[in-house]
Amino acid sequence: MESNDDRNLEAINASVGRLVWVRRRNGSWWPGQTLVHDQVPDNSLVGPKVGTPIKLLGRDDVSVDWYILENSKTVKAFRCGEYDTCIEKAKASSSKKRSGKCTLREDAINNALKIENEHLAKEDDNLCNLSGEEDSKRCLSGKEDEDSGSSDAEETEDDELASAPEQLQSSISSQEMNNVGASKVQSKRRRTPNDSEDDGTEGVKRMRGLEDIGKEQAGGIVEHKQDLDLICAVGLSDSVSNGNTIANGNKVCSPSSLKRNVSECSKRKNRRRQLTKVLESTAMVSVPVTCDQGVSLDCQGIYDSKVSGMESVESMKSVSVVINNNSDSTGVSCEDAYENVVGASHNNKAKDSEISSISVSAEDDSSDRLFDVPLTGEENHSEGFPAACRISSPRKALVTDLTRRCGRNSHNVFVKNEASNGSACTSPPASEPVNCILSGIEKNTSKWQLKGKRNSRQMSKKQEERRNVYGEEANNNSSTPHSTLYEVKIEVKASYTKPRVPLVSRMSELSGKAIVGHPLSVEILEEDYSNGMVMPPVVAKAKSLPKKNGKKQTTEKAKETVVACIPLKVVFSRINEVLKGSARQTQHRALPSAAKT
């Protein structure tokens, strides 16, 4: 049986922040904190003694006292349970205004509670760090075991395939593999709907702790093992039902099914990768395109255009290039001008990272131009270049900005369109003829898009009038280097206050009376001065109203602005007359009041 002193000592040692209750000489219990010998201040009145130093909280005037905790009955643990009511009262009174001697004791209790909370927070952080390190070590060890097991399984499968290629039979169909993989991918997407398909595991939208990372990694390993067990179980059931042979309990697959599985794995891997990494790994081939020499392209440099091999939902007016690998021709001839191909040139500039670029060498003398086209078609490629260049539905890829300003008023891509007439396009002498099949831009183009283009290219009548007044050209599409630009500084203030104008009193030279008012600055001009900027007459059109009693409504009313010069003497004479009239009115109003008094 443990004595009360031993229990008290254990409670003091287990106290958070080394907090204790100390009984003072007047009999009151005060919160304190045990110190280490190094923490004892040098200016303490009492020298070092045998025992443990304890400092009272909230009392700077009291020195450090030494107590023997094993035998002392004047020291108790802070959470011994006897003074919980005092702690609750101190918490409740911390938000209220207090006055008196009890405030010092309550402040000391609140100070002890702060120290306790700080130590608890530090201990929680240390526990989290330790648990996170242990989870990460476990995950790393699990990954190493899984990698070693998968490598051993691959080696055994390769040996079996090399030794007996004739006895290989497919035990797991590709459709079941697809179903299992698709169901697993859908379940993962349901768990994390914020993760995008292109980013994969890198596009996590929230911050996570070390514990969450360790749990997710361990959960991913368990799920992967469950998938492998499920696939093996399905293969065993199929082989038993179909009568396929199984050697030593291992599943045996055919070469065709293995190829399908490899291709499916590569596709899934590409889906999880970023678009930029996938485009960097895709092969590029140069396709020479010859244009007619009669068409003059008045270009001044190299223009960039973009081609994407993936479907774009946002691009409603794009063009796709489908390459058919069936012949050995190397040239494509384009002569006719095909309009409305560049439909989303400005909207697709922000997506340069998602689509691969096409380099166009546009020179005035040369007629051969090279286009770098990414190969995203079938796996089997024939020698040479693709046979047919087919421009199909405009939702597969983006071909934008091939020519920005070809000629003075042309924004078109020149393509030979003779497939509708049944004739083939011409090609260079060394290459065979190539059929260029052009399907038109979507017929169901909405009317509001066309109307928006017309409205953007036109200019309102008010803008034309204003530009004519100030001598500017009314050409909205001109972007020549001769256009002038003006820098206008605009200041926006939150609270605008008008400047205070003082009242000024002057003596009139005519009447000798005082004139009180605000000062006004007047600029004296020459006699022959005239303002050259006169606004044009504004024509106001009245709305058509129903005719009543045979009266005809006027449709136009002309209003002209007139600028006139008034002599300065006339202005001041008018001001004097107004001031005299106001003075007389004040005198008349003052007379009745004086009579009443």
From Swiss-Prot:
The segment(s) forming the PWWP domain are 16-78
Alphabetical list of InterPro entries matching this protein: PWWP2-like, PWWP_dom
Q: Where is this region: Disordered?
A: 126-210, 449-482
Q: Where is the composition biased (Polar residues)?
A: 166-185
A Pfam family this chain is assigned to:
PWWP
What are the Basic and acidic residues biased-composition ranges?
Answer: 134-143, 461-470
**Looking at the record's lineage, which domain of life comes first?**
Eukaryota
What phylogenetic lineage does the species belong to? Eukaryota, Viridiplantae, Streptophyta, Embryophyta, Tracheophyta
Q: Please note every region of biased composition (Basic residues).
A: 450-460
Name of the protein in its database record: Uncharacterized protein At1g51745
Ranges of Acidic residues composition bias in the record: 144-161
